[in-house]
Amino acid sequence: MSAAWFTMSVLPLSSQEKVWTLTDCIDYALNENIQVRKADVSLSVGEISLQQARDNRWPGVSASLGENIGWQQVTDTYGETSFEGSSRTNASLSSSVTLFSGFQTQNEIRQAEMSYKGLQYSKTETEENVTLNIMSAYLQVLYAEEQVANSRNQADATREELALAGERLGLGAIANSDYLQVKTQLASEEVTLTNAINNLKIAKVTLMQLMEYPVDESFDIARPDIDSIISVAPAADAVSVYQEALQVKPQIKSAEVNRESAEINLDIAKGGYFPSLSLNAGMSTGFTEAAEMGSQLKSGFSPSLGLSVSIPVFRNNQNKSSVARARYGITTAALDELNTRNQLRKEVEQAVLDAQSAGISYEAAVNQYEASIETYNVAEEKFKLGAMNSVDFLIQKTNLTSAESNLLQAKYKLVYSYKIIDFYRGIPLSF
C-alpha cells in the first residue's frame, strides 16, 4: 500500500443527526456497499453449488408414465373391413446411484468446499478494501477540518494586525504601502480560508459517497485525539509485520485455497482412470382396456435390479490430457500463491518504510514549526512596537503558515502510516 493517504474512493450514510465515529462509518459502508452485497450473493450461489456437490452422492429417482393408442384392420364375418383401436398404459419407476467412480464425487465435494472458502476470503478482501477507503476518507475530513481552523486563526490574527496597522497609519507611524501590504495579506488569507472550507465540504461529500450515504449538510464526524495516536509508534519491523500478515490477510488465504483446489482437481482427473460402478433398480407395469386394470397391473409388474461397471479402456487420451492440465494448474496456482506472498511482502516493506519516513518527517515538521512560532512571536512584538515593517513581518507570518501546513500534513500522513501497519497486522481500523 502506498502512503498516498489523501487519495480515496467513497460511499453514502443516513440522515439522522449524529456524530459518526470511524467505526460507525465503516459499519454503515459495509452494509451498503454494492461490491460487498454482490459478494454476499456470490456466497449464496457458492453455498448452493456446495450443497449440490454433496447431493450428488445420493441416488437419482425418475418416474415415467406413457399412454399408447393403436389401430388395426379387422374383417368381420361378412367380409367387411374396419379399424379397431386399442390403448395401453405403461408406468415405470427407476433409480440409479454411482457406488464408485474413482473417488471423483468425494473430491468434487472437497473442491466445492474449497471454492466456497475462496468466496468467503474474497468477500473479506472486499470488506478490507472498503474499510481502508473509509479510513482514508475519514482522515481527509479530519485534516480538512484542521486546515479550516488554522486558516481561520491566521485570518483572525491578520485582521487584528490590520486594525493595528490602521491605527498606526492614522498616527503617521507607518507608510500607506505598509498598511496595504497587511490588507493584501488579509485578503489572501480569506481566500485561503474559503478554499479550505470548500475542501472540507468536498472531503465530507467524498466520505458520504464512499459510505453510500445520501449527502447531508449536517453530517459530522467524531474527532479523535490524533496526538495520542501518533505518540505511540507501532513497535514492528517489516519481517514481523509480514509474518503476522501471512496469518490474517484474505488474499493469502484465497491463494492457498486456490492451490489446494488445483491439487484436488488433479485427484479428480486421476479418477478418470478408474472403473465406475453403478447400481440400478426399477419397476414397471402396464395395462390395456381389454381386461380388468387391477389384475393387469399385478400380473404385469416387473421389478429389476442390476449392477453395471464402466471400464475406461481408451478415451482418445482424454484422461491423460486432463491429468496433464491439472498438473499445470497446480504449478500455476503455486506460482500465483508465491506472487501473492511476494506482493504482500513488498506492500508491508513499503508500509513500514513509509511509517519510518513519516515519523522522521513529522519530527522535522515539529522542529520547523517550533522555530517558526518563536521567530513569529518576536516579529509580532517588533511589528506592534513599530520596530519592524510590514514586509519583514509578513515574511515571518508566511513562514509560520507554511510550517503549520507542513506540520498538519506530516501529522496526518503519520497517522495514516500507523493505521496501515495495523491493517496489515489484522488490527481493526479505529480511533
Where do the language-model regions lie?
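Short segments within alpha-helical structural elements
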Residues: 41, 55, 191-213, 369-427
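Bacterial Sec-pathway N-terminal export signals of envelope proteins
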Residues: 15-62, 66, 215, 222-260, ...
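Small/polar, glycine/serine/threonine/aspartate-rich low-complexity segments that form flexible
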Residues: 17-18, 64-97, 224-234, 267, ...
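Sec/SRP-type N-terminal targeting helices
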Residues: 37-41, 54-55, 85, 99-127, ...
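Periplasmic alpha-helical coiled-coil/stalk elements that build and connect Gram-negative outer-membrane
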Residues: 123, 129-244, 354, 358, ...
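N-terminal signal peptide c-region/cleavage motif recognized by signal peptidases
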Residues: 10-12
